[in-house]
Structures are given as structure tokens and as C-alpha cells.
């Protein structure tokens, strides 16, 4: 009598789960595929309507019409040349500005939030609860309410229309303080006691703890980089010179002049804007997942 293969039920479940998730996967990736293929389309092709079902039950030209609507007639790099040749938007300059702002905010926010979280988790001091409530308030209060005070503050310090004036407000984050407070609370006390027995100063103890929480550092750095990369409000208030603006502001201007800029060039700019965050998430996904699982 043959024995049933114990792996068959599990394999069947995976197949059924994959089939059930396939429509959701297609719904998620369709906008990205549409954007990428839109790079190579002319404006006439771009605005062709997409029919999701045939007008007639036996319409033999339906599938060819779907292909003609979804795929470009010709794959050409002309749209990339149009984008990079635009005088209205210095694309590589604003791309570099966004990269500098996002990296600066991510590194600064990780450093400042980690130190604040360590202090909240391991020390008792006067006003601790009040400061922690303020950190929560930074999350709950809409950022729009801080826009004008931040602009006035930067103007007073001479930081308006500078990338540093955009980076500096972004390193202060209530979410990071709460996140790292929880991270350092989960560390065993034995590590801290061992470091303090050796007579190390508190800063040295803190630096000793950092390798133990480096997945959390990497995860939060990734989150903050992505948030800073897509930030629109603060750069809009702070930056006025075209060469100082960030990528979201340039994309906004690019779409505002859609009559003179091809839709393919707009899709190319949007695709370029997506690449850094997509690559960062793909590289850091496993560490991000393990950090969240340890925290929860």
C-alpha cells in the first residue's frame, strides 16, 4: 500500500495561495508596468483608451488591440534624451539634491533618534514624560502647521534657500524617538551592566550598544530615507532657486508644463525617481523584516 506524500498538502496550499494572490499582484504591479512602458510611447499612444473586455463576444482583434494599447509601437530612448535635454528642469542637479537631502536627513535622524531613544529607555530624569509626550505630538500634529514656523526659523538663521535648511528640520522626528526607545528597552540589562562595570563613560556604553541594534538602525534609516525622498512640503517653502530644488518639486513643475513636455519624458522622470527607493528597499528588506519581528 503506497503512502501519501506528506509534502503534497503543503504544496497544494502554496499553489492555491499563489493563484489567489495573483490578481492582487497584477493590480499592484500594473501601474508600474504602465509607467515604464509609457516612457517609450508618443502622446498619441499614451492617450489611447484601454478596453478591459471586448465590445463584441467574438471580437478577434481584441487581444491585438490590448497589445497595441499597452505596449509602445517602437522602443526608443528619445524620451530619455528629451528629459535630460530639458532646460526647464535641471534633472541631474535636482536628483543629486534629493539624494543629498535624503541621506543627510536619514543619517542625522538615526543618530539623534538613537541617542534620544537610549536616554528615554535607560535613564530616569525630570521631565521625561513631558518630553516623551512631545515626541508623540510630533507624530500626531500635521506637518503643515510647522511649515511657516520652520521657514521663519530658517530665514532668521540664514538657512533659507539652502539644502541644509531642508536637512536640519528633518532630523528631528518623534517616530524615531519612540522607535528607538522601544528598541533599547528590549536589550538585556546585563550588557549595560558589563560595560558600566568596566568604568566606561556613558557615551562609550551607548556606542557599545549600537552593534547590537544595527538592524534597527538600518531599518529606520531606510524608512526615513524614503520619507525624505518623497518630501514635498518643506522643500517647497525653503527652496526658491531652481538649481537647489529637490526631485519632487521638479516633477511637479514638469507635470505643470505638460503641454510642452511629452508624457514619455514625464514617465521617465517618475521612473528615475522611483529607482533609489526601490533599490534601497530590495537591499534592506530582510534586515527590515527581522528588525520588525524582533520589536514585535
Label the model's feature ranges.
Residues 4-296:
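A structural signal for multi-pass alpha-helical bundles of membrane permease subunits
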Amino acid at each position: 500500500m503506497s503512502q501519501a506524500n506528506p509534502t503534497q498538502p503543503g504544496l497544494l496550499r502554496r499553489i492555491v495561495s499563489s493563484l489567489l494572490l495573483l490578481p492582487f499582484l497584477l493590480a499592484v504591479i500594473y501601474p508600474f508596468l504602465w509607467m515604464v512602458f509609457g516612457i517609450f510611447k508618443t502622446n498619441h499612444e499614451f492617450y489611447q483608451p484601454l478596453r478591459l473586455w471586448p465590445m463584441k463576444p467574438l471580437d478577434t482583434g481584441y487581444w491585438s488591440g490590448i497589445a497595441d494599447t499597452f505596449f509602445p509601437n517602437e522602443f526608443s530612448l528619445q524620451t530619455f534624451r528629451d528629459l535630460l535635454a530639458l532646460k526647464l528642469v535641471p534633472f541631474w542637479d535636482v536628483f543629486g539634491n534629493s539624494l543629498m537631502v535624503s541621506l543627510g536627513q536619514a543619517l542625522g535622524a538615526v543618530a539623534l533618534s538613537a541617542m534620544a531613544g537610549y536616554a528615554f529607555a535607560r535613564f530616569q530624569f525630570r521631565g521625561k514624560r513631558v518630553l516623551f509626550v512631545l515626541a508623540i505630538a510630533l507624530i500626531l500634529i500635521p506637518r503643515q502647521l510647522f511649515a511657516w514656523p520652520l521657514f521663519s526659523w530658517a530665514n532668521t538663521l540664514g538657512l533659507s534657500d539652502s539644502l541644509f535648511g531642508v536637512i536640519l528640520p528633518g532630523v528631528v522626528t518623534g517616530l524615531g524617538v519612540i522607535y528607538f526607545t522601544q528598541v533599547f528597552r528590549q536589550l538585556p540589562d546585563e550588557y549595560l551592566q558589563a560595560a558600566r562595570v568596566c568604568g566606561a563613560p556613558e557615551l562609550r556604553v551607548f556606542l557599545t550598544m549600537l552593534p547590537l541594534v544595527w538592524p534597527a538602525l538600518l531599518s529606520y534609516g531606510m524608512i526615513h530615507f524614503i520619507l525624505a525622498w518623497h518630501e514635498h512640503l518643506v522643500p517647497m517653502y525653503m527652496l526658491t532657486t531652481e538649481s537647489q530644488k529637490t526631485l519632487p518639486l521638479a516633477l511637479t513643475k514638469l507635470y505643470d508644463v505638460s503641454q510642452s513636455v511629452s508624457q514619455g519624458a514625464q514617465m521617465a522622470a517618475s521612473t528615475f525617481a522611483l529607482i533609489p527607493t526601490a533599490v534601497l528597499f530590495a537591499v534592506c528588506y530582510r534586515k527590515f523584516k527581522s528588525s520588525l519581528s524582533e520589536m514585535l
